[in-house]
Amino acid sequence: MYVPEEIIETIKMIEYQNLDIRTTTLGVNLKDCADKDLDLLKENIYNKITSYGGNLVETANKVSQKYGIPIVNKRISVTPIGLIMGSTLKGLSNEEAVDACVEVGITLDNIAKEVGVDFIGGYSALVQKRATPEEKMLIRSIPKLMTKTDRVCASVNVATTKAGINMYAVKKMGEIVKETSEITKDAIGCAKIVVFCNAPEDNPFMAGAFHGPGEGDAVINAGVSGPGVVRAVVEQLKGKDIGTVSDEIKKTAFKITRMGELVGKEVASELGVDFGIVDLSLAPTPAIGDSIANILEAVGLERCGTHGTTAALAMLNDAVKKGGAMASSNVGGLSGAFIPVSEDAGMIEAVEVGALRLEKLEAMTCVCSVGLDMIAVPGKTPASTLSAIIADEMAIGMINKKTTAVRIIPVPGKDVGDSVEYGGLLGTAPIMPVSEFSSEELIERGGRIPAPIQSLTN
């Protein structure tokens, strides 16, 4: 039995506190699309995705209207393309292989535009130990792909707790990010490239979503969003002890997650596919009040980034997970609090006033998901420094048995004090300083950082 107060509370969450379903993401298996002939491969991919996803946007909109809950993004993720290119690329020169990979990426982009989804993820390679020849070609093709597509997202998993860190891949990804920044407007291509440690197979969020090899043929995964709701709750708890704050956040996360599961299951049922998971991640937007940083400040920090930020974030992340896990048996993806600088109005302000630096963000990634996200750095930053930043973040994920990632944007012609405007969900990125001391010798060593002792769990 619902009481009027609960109904009013739900209306407030949606109308005034920016509560929404951030994404319903359709995962599609493409393993059965592989073919020696490039044209047949592209045709198979087109037929498979459109057969499952042709009505995704229409269905999500219908469910959104039925429940009065906004579904902000409709997206598609596919099997990592690096896993299905082997037979197609056999016998081709390196240049031909790169072009073939890009053609597949363009096919994905055309499909995304035809079915009306915001992004399509899965232009991906899983190279945590070593890369196959086709995966090397796919990685090499990423900068060119970003100049020719609008909606395709690329991700590369270069480390896991079980495998260690592939430092050859880390070095290469620094170079790929640098090259992409130089050939796409305002380095926008870099906003669609993520480097992972312990990448989840069922992540609904971009730019890191792909349909993992262990998944079924098609599945709907939902991602919720509710920083504004959590902030409103915390602001009512002035003077309460931190345990009480945690408990109230937990209750709020429960309600948010229930809504996400309801909508996700309904969309899956309408499409005739399985329901996968709800991702519990609190995902901010550039909208005022829809900010993770503002939640931390409501807990008691003058500015996000000051001493105590990591502790407050750890409490927030844990409370969200506990509340969400109670609300759903189908929790997965990244499931934490996102801290993307350019997509969070409070984070942007904290950087601009000098409260939040790259080193503090790195510490914060130890206790939340997912990593250094949407970080803009000076365009003059060398590729080796980008690789070293990636390596540090991969080490945090590997040792702590958690997902970490890096989405970093070296913006040509920009330096500390400048900012770059992307608009929409990508927001505004203030340029953050990086160390001027070199890490080049470390990165040039290559090889593999061995898996840590805590990987031996059997």
Swiss-Prot record:
InterPro entries: UPF0210 (IPR007841). It comes from the Archaea. Pfam families: DUF711. This is UPF0210 protein MmarC5_0151. Belongs to the UPF0210 family. PANTHER family: UPF0210 PROTEIN MJ1665, UPF0210 PROTEIN SPR0218. It comes from Methanococcus maripaludis (strain C5 / ATCC BAA-1333). The lineage of its organism: Archaea, Methanobacteriati, Methanobacteriota, Methanomada group, Methanococci.
